[in-house]
């Protein structure tokens, strides 16, 4: 039987094949072109190399393409995109190749290389790059460190809303999936605990389908029954991990990763189960409640907002200089950047970075106390604009007070901008706290770089495109 020939898509094909090596002119006023031309790459690459040397234990191997990788980091910072999209953009988007210094080369960094480079820099490394950009803005008179305002915010994690039944269902699913990937080492555990997995699946389905119409007591009873099943799984899993301990050293690649994951989930659930039992018994949430099985370092942050009283993720302190440039400080724990503490710490960090305190400083009423006002004055702040609580008086009056109130309101706009989808501060595609923190600093870096290039373009009376 003769095969039919496929009809060509074009009724009138080209006489000569079109070239796949186009020659185009990149506009001088393109945002990425101006950014590339204005950045002092010598200084920036020296800083990147210094950060890299502090983290690399051996200099063996081929040297990295720091110029291209730093350009890729800047490109990703100014507009949120996945790593593979970044690779594709750098390969085919002329302004991005110009930013990475690759217009005379056919080489392109792949997605894995870009990701490894960012993870090597880490949150602290990208924070230092951001401080470099802010100091550059101060030199260009686009930012004024003499006036600073500060606030705290929450970086929400990309996790489902935590509840006890959901966390236990996640545990069972993770244990089953990881045990299958481990292979023969946990084959006996899967066979022995098969009935428990079926029971857990049935209870989760019943809860999700029918608990909506039941009373709180009935819901708690269903949760307690599920907790009993999970406890049995935990006991059998602990025995299986002990018996298979000698085998773990022979595991390779994906099986080794699955073994590590199942151990981590097992340890997390050992802490979570008592918290669930405490909640069922008392009706109160336990201190340091685990809200994510896969990222147990996350915590709840009470915000008191309308429609969103609690957020789940990480706490950050944000400082804003006059001119709009931002500096971000990651909390080491849940209470590290509480308003009452960060109101003073922000000025201390400012002194560390610039060598002297701001002349004027503003913070909302969450940071007010007479002790904080006195401490800020001792640090050298002339105009202390902490919004007072109750009937207490302001430490400043008149136009100074009005100016500080106006500047204080602007920090909310900056925080809202970095949380927009363009920069990706909120709910980043991250599976660890370290990656979340890195994404947060990268969002602030992109915000400052875009602000920087717009300010420099305005001086030239140039309208940016791209």
Model-derived segments and their meaning:
Residues 54, 93-96, 136-139:
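A short structural micro-motif
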Residues 82-85, 90, 106-107, 114-466:
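Anion-binding and metal-coordination hotspots
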Residues 60-61, 99-105, 136-137:
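Catalytic micro-motifs at enzyme active sites that drive phosphoryl/nucleotidyl and oxygen chemistry
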Residues 25-74, 78, 394:
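Basic, short loop/linker segments at the boundary and entry of helix-turn-helix/winged-helix-like folds
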Residues 75-78, 92-96, 320:
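Amphipathic alpha-helical interaction surfaces
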Residues 93-113:
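Short, positively charged loop/turn segments that connect secondary-structure elements
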């Amino acid at each position: 039987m003769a095969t039919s020939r496929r009809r060509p898509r074009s009724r009138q094909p080209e006489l000569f094949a079109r070239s796949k090596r186009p020659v185009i002119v990149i506009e001088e006023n393109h945002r990425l072109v101006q950014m590339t031309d204005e950045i002092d790459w010598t200084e920036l690459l020296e800083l990147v190399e210094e950060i890299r040397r502090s983290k690399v234990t051996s200099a063996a191997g081929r040297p990295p393409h720091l110029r291209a990788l730093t350009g890729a980091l800047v490109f990703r910072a100014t507009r949120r995109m996945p790593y593979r999209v970044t690779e594709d953009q750098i390969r085919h988007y002329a302004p991005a190749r110009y930013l990475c210094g690759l217009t005379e080369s056919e080489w392109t960094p792949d997605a894995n290389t870009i990701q490894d480079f960012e993870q090597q820099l880490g949150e602290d490394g990208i924070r230092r790059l951001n401080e470099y950009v802010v100091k550059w803005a101060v030199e260009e008179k686009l930012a004024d460190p003499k006036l600073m305002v500060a606030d705290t915010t929450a970086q929400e994690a990309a996790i489902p809303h935590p509840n006890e039944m959901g966390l236990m269902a996640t545990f069972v699913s993770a244990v089953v999936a990881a045990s299958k990937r481990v292979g023969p080492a946990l084959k006996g555990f899967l066979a022995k605990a098969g009935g428990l997995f079926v029971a857990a699946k049935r209870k989760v389905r019943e809860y999700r389908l029918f608990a909506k119409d039941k009373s709180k007591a009935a819901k708690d009873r269903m949760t307690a029954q599920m907790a009993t099943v999970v406890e049995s799984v935990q006991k059998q899993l602990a025995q299986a991990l002990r018996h298979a301990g000698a085998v773990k050293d022979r595991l390779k690649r994906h099986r080794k990763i699955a073994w590590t994951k199942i151990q981590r989930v097992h340890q997390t659930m050992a802490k979570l189960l008592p918290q669930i039992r405490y909640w069922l018994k008392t009706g109160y949430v336990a201190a340091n409640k685990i809200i994510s099985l896969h990222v147990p370092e996350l915590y709840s942050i009470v915000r008191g907002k309308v429609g969103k009283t609690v957020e789940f993720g990480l706490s950050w302190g944000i400082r804003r200089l006059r001119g709009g440039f931002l500096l971000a400080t990651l909390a080491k724990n849940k209470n590290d950047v509480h308003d009452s503490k960060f109101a003073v710490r922000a000025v201390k960090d400012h002194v560390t970075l610039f060598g002297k305190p701001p002349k004027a400083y503003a913070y909302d009423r969450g940071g007010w106390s007479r002790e904080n006002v006195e401490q800020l004055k001792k640090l050298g702040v002339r105009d202390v604009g902490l919004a007072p609580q109750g009937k207490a008086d302001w430490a400043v009056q008149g136009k100074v007070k009005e100016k500080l109130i106006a500047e204080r309101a602007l920090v909310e706009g900056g925080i809202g901008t970095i949380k927009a989808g363009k920069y990706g501060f909120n709910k980043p595609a991250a599976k660890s706290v370290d990656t979340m923190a890195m994404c947060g600093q990268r969002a602030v870096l992109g915000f400052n770089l875009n602000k920087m290039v717009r300010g420099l373009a305005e001086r030239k009376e140039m309208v940016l495109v791209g």
